[in-house]
UniProtKB/Swiss-Prot annotation:
Belongs to the transcriptional regulatory Rex family. GO terms for cellular component: cytoplasm. Keywords: Cytoplasm, DNA-binding, NAD, Repressor, Transcription, Transcription regulation. The gene is rex. Modulates transcription in response to changes in cellular NADH/NAD(+) redox state. GO terms for biological process: negative regulation of DNA-templated transcription; response to redox state. This is Redox-sensing transcriptional repressor Rex. One of its GO terms (molecular function) is DNA-binding transcription factor activity. Residues 18-57 bind DNA. SUPFAM superfamilies: NAD(P)-binding Rossmann-fold domains, Winged helix' DNA-binding domain. It comes from Geobacillus kaustophilus (strain HTA426). Coiled coil: none annotated. It comes from the Bacteria. Pfam families: CoA_binding (PF02629), Put_DNA-bind_N (PF06971).
Length: 213
């Protein structure tokens, strides 16, 4: 996000893309304005939290009127720097990695996987979803400073050694889909997404906190 934007809580920052996606859908449907209650129902965030999130950016709406969809959409596009494409490198072209390459964030205008790496000779030299696949040995040669983000879908045992190489190459952010908990310098941001843990958590809540009928 732009350095000119006010410092906001990380929890709020994580919700901004969610708001933006919903606003794009509203705009596409021709809706001109939306209330915090309508936003709340759509994104499953309570209205008070939405109003507080929006308050960090000043007066985005009017009491009794709600929010102008076109204005909010334009505002969040600038805030999220939607007009600037962030290039991403993917590591590990297995089932999950292949799915990412075929999808390649088609709903996001500002994120694009531009290269992938693997050690499987059958995959090296091919393209998946239009993205070239290189051998992991070529990492230092291929990865450049214009690619600040890496997605890891490699075996857990290989994750830390790969991360160490990425740090040396100047990667600034890592989306980690491996079970490994990565050690990185303080200036590197890592988001861990462990699908097995998320599934276990969901099953636990279903069993122990059933929704009211």
């Amino acid at each position: 996000m732009s350095n000119e934007q006010p410092k906001i809580p990380q929890a709020t920052a994580k919700r901004l893309p969610l708001y933006y996606r919903f606003l794009k859908n509203l705009h596409a449907s021709g809706k001109q304005r939306v209330s915090s209650a309508e936003l709340s129902e759509a994104v499953k965030v309570d209205p008070a939290t939405i109003r507080r999130d929006f308050s960090y950016f000043g007066a985005l709406g009017k009491k009794g009127y709600g929010y102008n969809v076109n204005y909010l959409l334009s505002f969040f596009r600038r805030t999220l720097e939607e007009d600037e494409v962030t290039e991403v490198a993917l590591f590990g072209v297995g089932n999950l990695g292949t799915a990412f390459l075929n999808y390649n964030f088609s709903k996001n205008n500002n994120t694009k996987i531009v290269m992938a790496f693997d050690v499987d000779e059958r995959k090296v030299g091919t393209t998946v979803g239009g993205v070239p696949v290189y051998h992991l040995d070529e990492l230092e040669e291929r990865l450049h400073e214009n690619i600040p983000v890496a997605i890891l879908t490699v075996p857990a045992a290989a994750a830390q050694a790969l991360t160490d190489r990425l740090v040396v190459q100047g990667i600034k952010g890592i989306l980690n889909f491996t079970p490994a908990r990565l050690n990185v310098p303080n200036h590197i941001r890592v988001h861990h997404i462990d699908l097995a843990i998320e599934l276990q958590s969901l099953v636990y809540f279903l069993k122990n906190y059933p929704s009211p009928s």
